[in-house]
Amino acid sequence: SSFLQRGFDQVIHDIAIGGFPVRLLIDRAGIVGEDGETHQGVYDPAFLSQVGMPLYAPSNYAELTYWLHELLKDGCRGPRAIRYPRGGENARLAQYGCSGQDYDFLHRTEGAQAVLISYADEMDDILTACEKLTEHRINCDALKLVKLFPFTEKMIEAVKDYKIVLFAEECVEWGSIGEHLAYCL
């Protein structure tokens, strides 16, 4: 991710403007502390959404495999990017497999007025937060995004009626996926 930042002008001029069918696989997405301050993968969601590039963030190997195959099909035109964190698969998130959908509710409670939203490995923390809130009789749902940008109308419809929408991500604030969602809501 941090090396992609250094080539952002090429992403704009050599890929996005021409709409070329390039697939970017972005390793070390999110916070990667031990790699050093200048190697954090917290900018790519913001800058790739600025050029209108569809962006995906699988939460497990099954989703990564599925979306790699989907985005390599002939009918999938234009540039696309898949970002994934450093390290191995999160065991908890691996249990959810792959639905092939742009988003999934991983936790639902009847009468929930709040939804906690995230993507990739951060969903593990979201699920833990939902469990703790449920222990305190606070009903909430957990929504996992796989396709981060652009949002589908169906996803916006799924969250627009919640009284409270909380978004967590390892990304800079300005231009983040959470900021895009706030704008849409």
Predicted regions span which residues?
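Short, well-structured alpha-helical patches and their helix-loop capping segments
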Residues: 40, 56-59
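Thiamine diphosphate
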Residues: 4-8, 17-50, 73-185
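Conserved, well-ordered active-site substructure
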Residues: 14
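Conserved glycine-bearing catalytic or ligand-binding loops at nucleotide- and phosphate-handling centers
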Residues: 58-75
